[in-house]
Curated annotation (Swiss-Prot):
Residues 1-23 form the signal peptide. InterPro entries: UDP-glycosyltransferase, UDP_glucos_trans, UDP_glycos_trans_CS. It catalyses: glucuronate acceptor + UDP-alpha-D-glucuronate = acceptor beta-D-glucuronoside + UDP + H(+); 17alpha-estradiol + UDP-alpha-D-glucuronate = 17alpha-estradiol 3-O-(beta-D-glucuronate) + UDP + H(+); 17alpha-estradiol + UDP-alpha-D-glucuronate = 17alpha-estradiol 17-O-(beta-D-glucuronate) + UDP + H(+); 17beta-estradiol + UDP-alpha-D-glucuronate = 17beta-estradiol 17-O-(beta-D-glucuronate) + UDP + H(+). Keywords: Endoplasmic reticulum, Glycoprotein, Glycosyltransferase, Lipid metabolism, Membrane, Signal, Steroid metabolism, Transferase, Transmembrane, Transmembrane helix. Expressed in various tissues including the liver, kidney, testis, uterus, placenta, mammary gland, adrenal gland, skin and prostate. GO terms for biological process: estrogen metabolic process; steroid metabolic process; xenobiotic metabolic process. Its main location: endoplasmic reticulum. The gene is UGT2B17. It is a single-pass membrane protein. It comes from the Eukaryota. This is UDP-glucuronosyltransferase 2B17. It is found in: Endoplasmic reticulum membrane. UDP-glucuronosyltransferase (UGT) that catalyzes phase II biotransformation reactions in which lipophilic substrates are conjugated with glucuronic acid to increase the metabolite's water solubility, thereby facilitating excretion into either the urine or bile. Catalyzes the glucuronidation of endogenous steroid hormones such as androgens (epitestosterone, androsterone) and estrogens (estradiol, epiestradiol). Coiled coil: none annotated.
Length: 530
């Protein structure tokens, strides 16, 4: 840690002693890439407020880097995996999900997707084993007396650490495949009649056939698809804790779920008291651009600029795709700033400049920005919402197709398919988003909704973490559904009992009627004989 950061940190620690004593110790179980970028914003704010934040990360971590100066402390534990192992896996997963997995049939697509998820699950369980079975590490964590643990629900293990350390924990989450974690671990409600299943790319305004599709998705994810190899995880958790348990049972003990979206993005749906939506917590006003970049932006005149970024994971775009995209960009009057780390396309126009990195938030907040070409990552979409910039989506994998579908449904974006799009498709989508005022109007409506919140998303996220620390949990917000079996939750035992009562009554009434009928019949016959 640099002298500068050490001084800042010591001042913050001293402020705790002279304050009301509310500063706490936060342990973090992180996730890589955009998940970490989002969570880091929360952690930096916690540090600003005087809390001690320690991130538990493996020696193979890609982004959580101990060499970078920060007031956030790192506890690095050894693992047999290497950074190259993880990078290679993520790149292969990205390529397979984006280009190789066929979308021709529902069954084939999700069967291959489950294989990918289970490979990811195997990496996660290895990292988890290396942490919780490290006796020296666990002893050190026990002695540190943490107040709370913050984890991303996509990567299991944080809840196991919290259980072993006997501390409350919270989740940060965008979504899990098919809402499997939210349903089974969080008890969330998703009525299929009007809440589209994630990855279905549907909106809340579904016609009859779309509701059928949504129901099929829901049944598939509820009864067939497993985002994790649950047998392995359940067995591992039971062995470590020394009692029979399951992954989802342990996840169900989360005090709060901080969902990284908001109602400017989500479709309205019911949610539980221990859920808060904090989408866009990383967004902030734009800062001035570097001098050379600002000069290029200003040279666009009244036509303005287009910002183009497909995120940090795409670094191997084919030459054919790059040329096709560059050709489309060359045909618009706007200047284009394209985040691209590859061979310069032959069709690159004079209006387009390539950059290995872009100050994306600052560009989207620039008054000359007319449109944003994005892969549909949640962080990028929220920066576009924050600054009111309409989008053209080129979704690649994970939640990106669904994110862009949400923006399309709200009239703030158009999308093209990277597998099938032509230069003409991209050009037409760009022209529509830039020239048709309805897209700007709709994104500005979402932007106004986002800014018109009683408490900022980041402040709400930090409030709930501090709340859990102050009260040693938030059990009063946790629904009793977590204590019920599947049969009890769906009231199947009650329904069975009531049906049995009705059946018994019908049986008894029938028997009584038959008895009376026989008596009357015998009486009638006797009178005839007399």
């Amino acid at each position: 840690m640099s002298l500068k950061w050490m001084s800042v940190f010591l001042l913050m620690q001293l402020s705790c002693y002279f304050s009301s004593g509310s500063c706490g110790k936060v342990l973090v179980w992180p996730t890589e890439y955009s998940h970490w970028i989002n969570m880091k914003t929360i952690l930096e704010e916690l540090v600003q407020r005087g809390h001690e934040v320690i991130v538990l990360t493996s020696s193979a971590s890609i982004l959580v880097n101990a060499s970078k100066s920060s007031a956030i402390k790192l506890e690095v534990y050894p693992t047999s995996l290497t950074k190259n192992d993880l990078e290679d896996f993520f790149m292969k997963m990205f390529d397979r999900w984006t280009y190789s997995i066929s979308k021709n049939t529902f069954w084939s697509y999700f069967s291959q997707l489950q294989e990918l998820c289970w490979e990811y699950s195997d990496y996660n369980i290895k990292l988890c084993e290396d942490a919780v079975l490290n006796k020296k590490l666990m002893r050190k964590l026990q002695e540190s007396k943490f107040d709370v643990l913050l984890a991303d629900a996509v990567n299991p293990c944080g809840e196991l650490l919290a259980e072993l350390l006997n501390i409350p924990f919270l989740y940060s989450l965008r979504f899990s495949v098919g809402y499997t974690v939210e349903k089974n671990g969080g008890g969330f409600l998703f009525p299929p009649s009007y809440v589209p299943v994630v990855m279905s790319e549907l909106s809340d305004q579904m016609i009859f056939m779309e509701r059928i599709k949504n129901m099929i998705y829901m049944l598939y994810f509820d009864f067939w698809f497993q985002a994790y190899d649950l047998k392995k995880w359940d067995q591992f958790y039971s062995e470590v804790l020394g009692r029979p348990t399951t992954l989802f049972e342990t996840m169900g003990k989360a005090e709060m779920w901080l969902i990284r979206t908001y109602w400017d993005f989500e479709f309205p749906r019911p949610f539980l008291p221990n859920v808060d939506f904090v989408g866009g917590l990383h967004c902030k006003p734009a800062k001035p651009l570097p001098k050379e970049m600002e000069e290029f932006v200003q040279s666009s005149g009244e036509n303005g600029i287009v910002v183009f970024s497909l995120g940090s994971m795409i670094s191997n775009m084919s030459e054919e795709s790059a040329n096709m995209i560059a050709s489309a960009l060359a045909q618009i009057p706007q200047k284009v700033l394209w985040r691209f780390d590859g061979k310069k396309p032959n069709t690159l126009g004079s209006n387009t400049r390539l950059y290995k990195w872009l100050p994306q938030n600052d560009l989207l907040g620039h008054p000359k920005t007319k449109a944003f070409i994005t892969h549909g990552g949640t962080n990028g979409i929220y920066e576009a919402i924050y600054h009111g910039i309409p989008m053209v989506g080129i979704p690649l994998f994970a939640d990106q197709h669904d994110n862009i579908a949400h923006m399309k449904a709200k009239g703030a974006a158009l999308s093209v398919d990277i597998r099938t799009m032509s230069s003409r498709d991209l050009l037409n989508a760009l022209k529509s988003v830039i020239n048709d005022p309805i897209y700007k109007e709709n994104i500005m409506k979402l932007s106004r909704i986002h800014h018109d919140q009683p408490v900022k998303p980041l402040d709400r996220a930090v409030f709930w973490i501090e709340f859990v620390m102050r009260h040693k949990g938030a059990k009063h917000l946790r629904v009793a559904a977590h204590n019920l079996t599947w049969i009890q939750y769906h009231s199947l035992d009650v329904i069975a009992f009531l049906l049995a009562c009705v059946a018994t009554m019908i049986f008894m009434i029938t028997k009584c009627c038959l008895f009376c009928f026989r008596k009357l019949a015998k009486t009638g016959k006797k009178k005839k004989r007399d």
